[in-house]
Amino acid sequence: TDDDALKKHLAIVRRAESLQHQAVSSLIPADETPLETAIGLEQMVVDLTADLAQNEADDYFKQALDFALLEDLDHLFRFSLMYRMVEGGDAGWLTRDRTPIVAGRPTSAQHRHPVDELRPHFDLDEVPLRTLMNHLTIVSAEQEKMLFYKSSIRAYPEELTRRLFGEIAMVEEQHLSQYEDLGDPHTTPMELLVLMELNEAYNYFSAFKGESDPAIRTLWSELMEQELEHFHLAVALMERIEGRDAHELLGDAMIPSLIELKPNIGYIEALLSTQVNLQPFDGEFIPESRLPADWPSFSFRERMNSRGSPADEVEKRRPRERIRRPA
């Protein structure tokens, strides 16, 4: 953009967002290993995705969330096996047994050709505000995981651990492609800025309402207030630059429910019993047995697994019954 006022605004807000990221990152314990962080991230995304899916009005977006949930569940399982193998730790203690640590859709079956990650998009004007919040939330979560796994490859000398981080990082990129493709491509830059700032405030408020630690609750409150200020500034920019009133985009700006990270064992078990064998094809999720022989991902998967899947190797070395499951 050649709009100097807009560039100054974005530069200042970007600096504030960077400071927020540092503050949140500093909450990770200093003695937490990358595998422990990976287990925490996968638990968070499994329970987050389950919550978003159960509060999603758009049927196709909900299907996409359910589809990826079973893949992230498998990532939690594989990282847990690796954690026990490399560090002798029990992932059930890390997760407090709130999330099932069981195999989902096998990671080795998740390698898909890039064209098979394309999805039909929703229309900005036809979905409720909660859908827009769900979309931005899951995109951010998957991006954070992908970047962390890529940077964690160097943290371990064992080849299998390094390859597992790389394998799962690639699948997270696929998830990111899927979710980004679901968004309305006609959303304007100012509309997206307003929605992103609102989404951050919404996420911090959800965290604030669900937090029991007083100090961390105070942090969520402070960050929420910052994001509300960013939101109001973004609304003013949209009105000045695009001549749009925020009410046209947001309606009454009421989001009917907050994000709640809670155990979702029953929901996950139902998905495992009905959807673990699904794959994407031609805008649908169908059983793998119904896929055509020339489905691009068949040959792609074969090439990707030609040296063996690290996720499969981890399971071979550590039987799944060694990993605890919530009662």
Annotate each language-model stretch with its function.
Residues T1-A327:
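Non-heme di-metal
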